[in-house]
Amino acid sequence: PDMYAFGL
């Protein structure tokens, strides 16, 4: 869900 977190 986060912009820069492993595609989450």
Curated annotation (Swiss-Prot):
Annotated compartments: Secreted
Gene Ontology annotations for the cellular component aspect, listed alphabetically: extracellular region
Organism superkingdom: Eukaryota
Record keyword Disulfide bond present: no
One GO-annotated biological process of the protein: neuropeptide signaling pathway
Keyword presence, Secreted: yes
Similarity section: Belongs to the allatostatin family.
Name by which UniProt lists this protein: Carcinustatin-12
Lineage of the species this protein comes from: Eukaryota, Metazoa, Ecdysozoa, Arthropoda, Crustacea
